[in-house]
Amino acid sequence: MLDIRLFRNEPDTVKSKIELRGDDPKVVDEILELDEQRRKLIIATEEMKARRNKVSEEIALKKRNKENDDDVIAEMRTLGDDIKEKDSQLNEIDNKMTGILCRIPNLISDDVPQGESDEDNVEVKKWGTPREFSFEPKAHWDIVEELKMADFDRAAKVSGARFVYLTNEGAQLERALMNYMITKHTTQHGYTEMMVPQLVNADTMYGTGQLPKFEEDLFKVEKEGLYTIPTAEVPLTNFYRNEIIQPGVLPEKFTGQSACFRSEAGSAGRDTRGLIRLHQFDKVEMVRFEQPEDSWNALEEMTTNAEAILEELGLPYRRVILCTGDIGFSASKTYDLEVWLPSYNDYKEISSCSNCMDFQARRANIRFKRDKAAKPELAHTLNGSGLAVGRTFAAIVENYQNEDGTVTIPEALVPFMGGKTQISKPVK
């Protein structure tokens, strides 16, 4: 959520930033109008409360002097009713303002390129060279079924479209990837490992920005009023919700693996085959809590942490800056990492790393103190995929496939695969 002071002090800046996302800047005028009404109500209410205190003194004086106090008692009752009415009006305006503010996205960093869609994202780095095959490469969805690594048909029977059973060495590869990623982030990148709740309440979803605007993208357990998480970013970031982080704790770096659940509303017809766009998938997440002056360097470091996984696995990728029309709701700046997939003859997103600045912290009330005597300040929060496991799985299978139908295991994964160096079709 944005600071109301930005609307008061820099309305034109806020309007231009909102317009860059393709949203209606008139919302700024709505907020300012409500804010003015609110301030007038507060002044009127304070004046009434001051008068009520004065009347209370007059009543006491009249009682001491045994004078008739009917008139001041009547005024006291009227003031009480009027104050109650003003408080009700103030509460209504507060709710209206919050309802509007919570749907306004974060302000975009000045260095984010302008554009309308992912076609306008800007490449800033490329690593590795896509492999030139001496045979016709297969798509990962064909390879995994031939090698008995996955079963999409039975998953559809059990759960519907966009689900998968990972079987045999497919399940082993998924588990190996998660273990490898978590191990690298904790032992080399300085993150603390967390196992997170995968059902969370509405306040938690609100804190990271999924609610109220994106409820259609979520799965909800109606009876309990809980939501399945779309990413471990949600419970990891909310770890410090409604807390003041004590001096010396920041920077705080968490990583965790979880299943992620997404309805994929609006993605009908896109990536309908394979592991690229499922309703349930595994992902290793990185979340950081930083002091404001450190968050931009932290974004670069976090993105490098994700890139290190791809480089050690030998997977060609590129880094792009998301443009103003493609960046997420809570982010001020986002880098996407896109891995090369031969079946698409293109790069596909495998990680998003974002600096949300104080946007999520204001919603979730996450503050920190620089020292014991300091006033609490809003922390900056960052999140990044490190990586999407299913997409990494698909990239390995496609980029490391062999003409005889086998798949070579990247060297970095061999210890996590029990020493296995190749995946072949099971004998039985």
From Swiss-Prot:
One of its GO terms (cellular component) is cytoplasm. L-serine binds at T231, A232, E233, E285, S385. It is found in: Cytoplasm. GO terms for biological process: selenocysteine biosynthetic process; seryl-tRNA aminoacylation. It is an enzyme of class 6 (ligase). It catalyses: tRNA(Ser) + L-serine + ATP = L-seryl-tRNA(Ser) + AMP + diphosphate + H(+); tRNA(Sec) + L-serine + ATP = L-seryl-tRNA(Sec) + AMP + diphosphate + H(+). GO terms for molecular function: ATP binding; catalytic activity, acting on a protein; serine-tRNA ligase activity; transferase activity. Pathway: Aminoacyl-tRNA biosynthesis; selenocysteinyl-tRNA(Sec) biosynthesis; L-seryl-tRNA(Sec) from L-serine and tRNA(Sec): step 1/1. SUPFAM superfamilies: Class II aaRS and biotin synthetases, tRNA-binding arm. ATP binds at R262, S263, E264, E349, I350, S351, S352. Pfam families: Seryl_tRNA_N, tRNA-synt_2b. InterPro entries: aa-tRNA-synt_IIb, aa-tRNA-synth_II, aa-tRNA-synth_II/BPL/LPL, Ser-tRNA-ligase_type_1, Ser-tRNA-synth_1_N, SerRS_1_N_sf, SerRS_core, tRNA-bd_arm. Its EC number is 6.1.1.11. The keyword Protein biosynthesis applies. Keywords: Aminoacyl-tRNA synthetase, ATP-binding, Cytoplasm, Ligase, Nucleotide-binding, Protein biosynthesis. HAMAP family: Ser_tRNA_synth_type1 (MF_00176). Catalyzes the attachment of serine to tRNA(Ser). Is also able to aminoacylate tRNA(Sec) with serine, to form the misacylated tRNA L-seryl-tRNA(Sec), which will be further converted into selenocysteinyl-tRNA(Sec). PANTHER family: SERINE--TRNA LIGASE (PTHR43697:SF1), SERYL-TRNA SYNTHETASE (PTHR43697). Homodimer. The tRNA molecule binds across the dimer. Belongs to the class-II aminoacyl-tRNA synthetase family. Type-1 seryl-tRNA synthetase subfamily. Consists of two distinct domains, a catalytic core and a N-terminal extension that is involved in tRNA binding. This is Serine--tRNA ligase. It comes from Staphylococcus aureus (strain bovine RF122 / ET3-1). The lineage of its organism: Bacteria, Bacillati, Bacillota, Bacilli, Bacillales. The gene is serS.
